[in-house]
């Protein structure tokens, strides 16, 4: 098992002879800390998608949005965002309460098209200093990127997806 791949990934990579390119992509795409470009991309985002799963592994994918800067990089390997009551179902945050693993996908389709993935472990709290500085938020979510590959990122033209679709 590696930062990006588990046994299931590896079996399919071997079956379709893509292990070498997969290893190269992992080498090129994983980081031990957010770069200045990662930070600028994240903090300029007006939305992102968040993937969570409940304790039984049932997945959920949600949209989170706000003004630029609503997501902040708070440490070399951490970001934080406020949660606003949308529909009151608490699907994502409820899942995080029982399974802290999270995937986030930031996409910019405008001036400089690109995307950035962050996989990590989240905490959800009402006892965070950012809450007082965030009007209307109920909770703060902090995500610590996982392992030594803190951020898994790609910022390239959307048309260039041949090797980075997974």
Could you tell me what each predicted segment is?
Residues 1-166:
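Binding-site signature for planar aromatic cofactors or substrates
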């Amino acid at each position: 098992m590696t930062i990006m791949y588990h046994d299931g990934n590896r079996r399919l990579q071997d079956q379709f002879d893509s292990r070498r390119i997969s290893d190269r992509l992992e080498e090129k795409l994983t980081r031990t800390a957010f770069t200045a470009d990662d930070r600028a991309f994240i903090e300029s985002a007006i939305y992102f998608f968040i993937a969570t799963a409940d304790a039984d592994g049932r997945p959920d994918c949600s949209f989170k949005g706000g003004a630029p800067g609503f997501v902040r990089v708070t440490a070399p390997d951490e970001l934080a965002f406020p949660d606003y009551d949308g529909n009151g179902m608490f699907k994502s945050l409820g899942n995080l309460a029982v399974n802290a693993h999270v995937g986030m996908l930031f996409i910019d389709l405008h001036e400089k098209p690109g995307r950035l993935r962050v996989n990590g472990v989240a905490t959800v709290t009402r006892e965070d200093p950012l809450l007082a500085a965030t009007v209307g938020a109920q909770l703060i979510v902090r995500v610590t990127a996982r392992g030594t590959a803190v951020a898994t990122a790609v910022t390239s033209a959307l048309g260039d997806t041949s090797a980075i679709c997974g």
